[in-house]
Amino acid sequence: MTTQLEQAWELAKQRFAAVGIDVEEALRQLDRLPVSMHCWQGDDVAGFENPEGSLTGGIQSTGNYPGKARNATELRADLEQALRLIPGPKRLNLHAIYLESDTPVARDQIKPEHFKNWVEWAKANRLGLDFNPTCFSHPLSADGFTLSHPDAKIRQFWIDHCKASRRVSAYFGEQLGTPSVMNIWIPDGMKDITVDRLAPRQRLLEALDEVISEKFDPAHHIDAVESKLFGIGAESYTVGSNEFYMGYATSRQTALCLDAGHFHPTEVISDKISAAMLYVPRLLLHVSRPVRWDSDHVVLLDDETQAIASEIVRHNLFDRVHIGLDFFDASINRVAAWVIGTRNMKKALLRALLEPTDQLRQLEASGDYTARLAMLEEQKSLPWQAVWEMYCQRHDTPAGSQWLDSVRTYEKEILSKRS
């Protein structure tokens, strides 16, 4: 430890102690909060099923930065590079299209064996795994419907895919000793004015009930469902709306997924956390950065990211909220995108843990809103960066922008050689 870092650390401890915060306890709490990194940033949501196929489902990955992963070996190598530069506990979130097989596998036929390499890799890297059925980028989703499809055979295909995905998810949890959160998101919707909005939702309700009918140990598997306001090609009607999934998660007691980009631009998920937690047992968060729409830009340390972290910490939701990331930017170095976004999420959590919440709550309860605002603003100037640097030091990761040197070296030696 350098003398400069030691001095900054000691000063930070004193400054935070003055407002009643134990920084060592804050770091212990931070080590209880894993962030689930999403594998699809590494290859622009291509997967291994049909890497040259088109990305569909009303989502887009824009840009053509060189060096994207072309297979599982490259993707895992890129992930390892990113993991080395991010302090503290992490998880990895996989989509079904990241299976590995020597022969083609239909999505309704995926099995745990197709993800064995991921499990062994996760064990070696001390990671938990999360999972997602992939209900897009497939011929049977081309007309914009999956679990709510009017054709019973096509609908059953997607039901069977989700059921198979749940078995994979339970396998992850059983093998790794930590529950896998499996999130169901479907692109189902219509481009223009929709006359019958009810029937597709009735079909979706029945399909989801069949999907979750097989029981799994919650120590191994957790179901989550995710809404969306609209997607490209589904601007006028989305079957799986917020109201639909809020009702479903409440009535079936599944987890509810809140994606930062899946609501109207004037809405924020930080305000939805406390409301949803009154009705559902768990929340899955997809922290992202929507720019005018669900653009999935890299997460910043901005007001909304901070507000999300603060909601988790202020209400002690550590065991009920699962933090995941969801962005995919192909215009910048993909390893750097992982590092920037994940470190920012962890910084936000640390800043929330360093807040004198009890004092602020007392001021609020007494009606002293002047002092509440003053303290919130003064808190921003306290030396949280010194605490972050100590956290990085303890986890053998670069504290400042030095991590970028490692990414540049990796880009020169590895990524630049990919055609």
UniProtKB/Swiss-Prot annotation:
Pfam families: RhaA. This is L-rhamnose isomerase. Homotetramer. Binds 1 Mn(2+) ion per subunit. Pathway: Carbohydrate degradation; L-rhamnose degradation; glycerone phosphate from L-rhamnose: step 1/3. One of its GO terms (biological process) is L-lyxose metabolic process. Mn(2+) binds at H262, D294, D296. GO terms for cellular component: cytoplasm. HAMAP family: RhaA. Its EC number is 5.3.1.14. Belongs to the rhamnose isomerase family. Its cofactor is Mn(2+). It comes from Salmonella typhi. Keywords: Cytoplasm, Isomerase, Manganese, Metal-binding, Rhamnose metabolism. One of its GO terms (molecular function) is manganese ion binding. Catalyzes the interconversion of L-rhamnose and L-rhamnulose. It catalyses: L-rhamnopyranose = L-rhamnulose. It is found in: Cytoplasm. It comes from the Bacteria.
